[in-house]
């Protein structure tokens, strides 16, 4: 695989294996005439195979364009395709760009009255066919466009096309991850080593909401089962049977500890009779005269 890039920017065997494992080289049966230079061959079943070498060259070229912009916030990354929502949000969080995940509000680049109005210097889209509204508005206000393009993608108003499979969740996540890593390397934020960036590519992959909810339920059930097991294994609190009994009562444990026999037929010790006619032991003082003026007058 011949490459026109300098040796320091060339793809390593590990990066080529990542692209192949994510099926970034698998195109579609349809092919646009402007995407023909990026096609390597066509399989017997009609699927077009992309040239991985040209994919890497255009990826590095796009990263150099993004790194040349002084303010990272002037870059806007867009994905209306659900598989790219998490990828663009992670890219924006790591590089400082603006992210539009989901529906693109018409007029965001042309109508300054709208609340979502933006003036970026560059936009990066996941699919030119799905993000056509953003590309068209960018053409009205002279904003350059970088796009991940499949073999059937229209290249109208697209300035830099990165040929890749933009319909697979793993391919989209990998391409955004590689682009973010290359931008950070060119900015000097991370070193150009294999372990220079500790963000895993899995963080950029799309996750099904039902799958996430199921995983959270399984984790909650596992925590509940672990808590129930700990509660079952914990020893019960033992009462101190050797403590002194309450007044008028008998402590069987204390009697057994002293070696005596407990006579259950014996009558309990009765308290003395209560004389309700006796005077109270302490004076309440309700009838006493006040010692000093109260100050109410």
UniProtKB/Swiss-Prot annotation:
<comment type="function">
    <text>Required for the assembly and/or stability of the 40S ribosomal subunit. Required for the processing of the 20S rRNA-precursor to mature 18S rRNA in a late step of the maturation of 40S ribosomal subunits.</text>
</comment>
<dbReference type="InterPro" id="IPR032281">
    <property type="entry name" value="Ribosomal_uS2_C"/>
</dbReference>
<dbReference type="Pfam" id="PF16122">
    <property type="entry name" value="40S_SA_C"/>
</dbReference>
<dbReference type="InterPro" id="IPR027498">
    <property type="entry name" value="Ribosomal_uS2_euk"/>
</dbReference>
<feature type="region of interest" description="Disordered">
    <location>
        <begin position="265"/>
        <end position="297"/>
    </location>
</feature>
<keyword id="KW-0963">Cytoplasm</keyword>
<keyword id="KW-0687">Ribonucleoprotein</keyword>
<dbReference type="GO" id="GO:0000028">
    <property type="term" value="P:ribosomal small subunit assembly"/>
</dbReference>
<dbReference type="InterPro" id="IPR001865">
    <property type="entry name" value="Ribosomal_uS2"/>
</dbReference>
<dbReference type="InterPro" id="IPR005707">
    <property type="entry name" value="Ribosomal_uS2_euk/arc"/>
</dbReference>
<comment type="subunit">
    <text>Component of the small ribosomal subunit. Mature ribosomes consist of a small (40S) and a large (60S) subunit. The 40S subunit contains about 33 different proteins and 1 molecule of RNA (18S). The 60S subunit contains about 49 different proteins and 3 molecules of RNA (25S, 5.8S and 5S). Interacts with RPS21.</text>
</comment>
<dbReference type="GO" id="GO:0006412">
    <property type="term" value="P:translation"/>
</dbReference>
<dbReference type="InterPro" id="IPR023591">
    <property type="entry name" value="Ribosomal_uS2_flav_dom_sf"/>
</dbReference>
<dbReference type="Pfam" id="PF00318">
    <property type="entry name" value="Ribosomal_S2"/>
</dbReference>
<dbReference type="GO" id="GO:0022627">
    <property type="term" value="C:cytosolic small ribosomal subunit"/>
</dbReference>
<dbReference type="InterPro" id="IPR018130">
    <property type="entry name" value="Ribosomal_uS2_CS"/>
</dbReference>
<protein>
    <recommendedName>
        <fullName>Small ribosomal subunit protein uS2</fullName>
    </recommendedName>
</protein>
<comment type="similarity">
    <text>Belongs to the universal ribosomal protein uS2 family.</text>
</comment>
<dbReference type="GO" id="GO:0003735">
    <property type="term" value="F:structural constituent of ribosome"/>
</dbReference>
<keyword id="KW-0689">Ribosomal protein</keyword>
């Amino acid at each position: 695989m011949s490459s026109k890039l300098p040796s320091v920017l060339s793809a390593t065997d590990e990066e080529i294996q990542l692209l192949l494992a994510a099926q970034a080289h698998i195109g579609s049966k349809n092919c646009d005439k402007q995407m023909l230079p990026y096609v390597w061959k066509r399989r017997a079943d009609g699927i077009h195979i992309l040239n991985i070498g040209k994919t890497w060259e255009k990826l590095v070229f796009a990263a150099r364009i993004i790194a040349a912009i002084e303010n990272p916030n002037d870059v806007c990354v867009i994905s209306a395709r659900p598989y790219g929502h998490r990828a663009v949000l992670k890219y924006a969080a790591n590089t400082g760009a603006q992210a539009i995940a989901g529906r693109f509000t018409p007029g965001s680049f042309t109508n300054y009255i709208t609340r979502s109005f933006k003036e970026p210097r560059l936009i990066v889209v996941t699919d030119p066919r799905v993000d056509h509204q953003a590309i068209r508005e960018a053409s009205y206000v002279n904003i350059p466009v970088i796009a991940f393009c499949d073999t059937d993608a229209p290249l109208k108003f697209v300035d830099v096309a990165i040929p890749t499979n933009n319909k697979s969740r793993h391919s989209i996540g990998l391409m955004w991850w590689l682009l973010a890593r290359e931008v950070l390397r060119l900015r000097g934020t991370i070193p150009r080593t294999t372990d220079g960036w500790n963000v895993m590519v899995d963080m950029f992959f799309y996750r099904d909401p039902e799958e996430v909810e199921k995983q959270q339920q399984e984790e909650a059930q596992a925590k509940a089962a672990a808590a129930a097991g700990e509660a079952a294994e914990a020893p019960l609190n033992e009462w101190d049977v050797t403590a002194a009994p309450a007044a008028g009562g008998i402590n069987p444990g204390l009697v057994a500890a002293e070696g005596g026999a407990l006579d259950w037929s014996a009558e309990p010790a009765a308290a003395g009779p209560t004389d309700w006619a006796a005077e109270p032991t302490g004076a309440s003082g309700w009838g006493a005269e006040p010692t000093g003026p109260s100050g109410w007058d």
